Design a protein with these regions (language model features):
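Sliding clamp-binding short linear motifs
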Residues: 2-170
Length: 172
């Protein structure tokens, strides 16, 4: 699944099956519909924190965001899932705080006096520098949230061991 390319339901894209967002456990249909509307209006999401800001107030909650991360929806943005998981509370809190300030007309920390209180585009999300989850942990998260192994399979590590094994068909 991809936060910018996946639709609500499964779709076929250039002969490949694109995973539907409704199949991700913990992500409601209301959030998915809002996400698709937001992509049409504001274009693709370019960063994780931008996604959280734009989707704030649209049924977005910690559980849904963590499910999207575990399913790999932000992988194509270049983030490590472990770093995102460690930053969820901070980023969601910042998005909610920014939304509250915008409602009250206050400028935020990154606003210039002449920009109407809007955040400057030069701000960039800083994530913790951590090692990524192991391959086994990543595919286990995918299986937990989608019911499928998406980027690998637990038996992949044993493929080389199985290659030299031969077999004979027996007919009785």
């Amino acid at each position: 699944p991809d936060i910018n390319a996946s639709d609500a339901d499964f779709t076929v894209e250039e002969g490949d099956l694109r995973f539907g967002l409704v199949a991700i456990k913990g992500v409601g249909r209301g959030l998915i519909q809002a996400l698709m509307r937001e992509r049409q209006i504001g274009g693709p999401f370019t960063a994780f924190d931008e996604f959280c800001r734009r989707m704030n107030g649209h049924d977005l909650n910690r559980r849904a965001v963590e499910s999207l991360i575990r399913a790999g929806c932000f992988d194509r943005m270049g983030y490590k899932r472990k770093a995102l998981m460690q930053s969820v509370d901070r980023v969601l809190g910042g998005a909610a705080s920014e939304s509250r300030m915008n409602l009250t007309g206050q400028m935020n920390l990154f606003s210039a006096p002449d920009d109407g209180g809007q955040p400057a585009d030069t701000t960039q999300l800083v994530l913790p520098d951590v090692e990524e989850f192991t391959r086994a942990e990543l595919i286990a998260m995918e299986r937990e949230t989608t019911g499928l192994y998406l980027t690998g399979h637990p038996m992949d590590d044993y493929r080389a061991l199985a290659q030299p094994v031969s077999y004979t068909h027996l007919t009785l």
